[in-house]
Amino acid sequence: MPWLQIRINTTPDHVPAFEDTLLDCGAMVVTFEDVHDDPVYEPDLNTTPLWKNTKVTGLFEADADIEHIRPVIEHKAESLGETDIDMKIEIVEDKDWEREWMDNYHPIQFGERLWVCPSWREVPDPNAVTLMLDPGLAFGTGTHPTTALCLQWLDSIDCKDKTIIDYGCGSGILGIAGLLLGANNMVGIDIDPQAVQATEANAERNKIDPSRLEVKLPPYESDLQADIVVANILAGPLAHLAPTISALVKNQGQLALSGILANQAQEVIEAYQEWFTIDSITEKEEWVRIVGTKHA
């Protein structure tokens, strides 16, 4: 059967109010999406991660009284200071929503050897290195340029018998990719307990021996170091945490930083030059990856 769909574009702080309003008006379900397909980075503790511009969608039965619902939403928008609400109302045909969502995700190749593949898809190349990973709300799945840049770099280097730290690990995608590419063991570091569960679950899904993987919440031991460190977070935290992240890299070890817009790259480079020789800066869709080798 058809449905009445109401979509509201708003800011994260107004999302709960619009969600409650839609549910109070009789919405069968309310969902959140990103307006501009931006990434959601790992959330702080006890927070719900949302995009800077969020689309709130409510689905109602087709015969819902829109003449009653519309003014209720407009009144709520006015009370929130949104005098010109961005709202779209339409009738949509019934469909298998779960199937449509799943159909949007396909195996993706990163570099020469590495693929990331949803669990419901057939592995495209049985001889390739395949990381099985399903999409989730807060953590990376390889679709964003910053994650792609890091995965491509891991595919291009020699991970064999190395140790790797995935700083801000989220889903653990980067560290697990390193293990599949030959690293001996990996340590994931994150401030969110959800990351521990997500990384361990994804490692199990990829048949990683638990002895090769550990996920830590701060504080961690002061002498922790690895041959390879990957940090895909944001430019501000990367610059602020430069001494902390640099200390995790062994002498002559490799560091890859991403989550950085092109116009932020110089700030991050300057924060790390004390400890690293910058080997390369790679740009993809206005995002960059900075790679360096630690001084002996």
UniProtKB/Swiss-Prot annotation:
Per UniProt, S-adenosyl-L-methionine binds at T147, G168, D190, N232
Report if keyword Methyltransferase is assigned.
Answer: yes
Principal localization reads cytoplasm
Q: Which GO terms describe its biological process?
A: methylation
Under the heading InterPro entries, the entry gives: Ribosomal_L11_MeTrfase_PrmA, Ribosomal_PrmA_MeTrfase, SAM-dependent_MTases_sf
Q: Which Pfam families match?
A: PrmA
Q: Indicate the enzyme's highest-level EC class.
A: transferase
Q: Where in the cell is it found?
A: Cytoplasm
Its domain of life reads Bacteria
Spell out the reaction equation it catalyses: L-lysyl-[protein] + 3 S-adenosyl-L-methionine = N(6),N(6),N(6)-trimethyl-L-lysyl-[protein] + 3 S-adenosyl-L-homocysteine + 3 H(+)
Q: Name one GO molecular function term.
A: protein-lysine N-methyltransferase activity
Q: Which ranges form a coiled coil?
A: none
Q: Which GO terms describe its cellular component?
A: cytosol
For this UniProt record, give its keywords in alphabetical order, as a comma-separated list: Cytoplasm, Methyltransferase, S-adenosyl-L-methionine, Transferase
> Which EC number(s) are documented for this chain?
2.1.1.-
Q: What does this protein do?
A: Methylates ribosomal protein L11.
In the record, the note on similarity to other proteins reads:
Belongs to the methyltransferase superfamily. PrmA family.
Q: What is this protein called?
A: Ribosomal protein L11 methyltransferase
Organism lineage string:
Bacteria, Pseudomonadati, Pseudomonadota, Gammaproteobacteria, Oceanospirillales
Q: What gene is behind this protein?
A: prmA
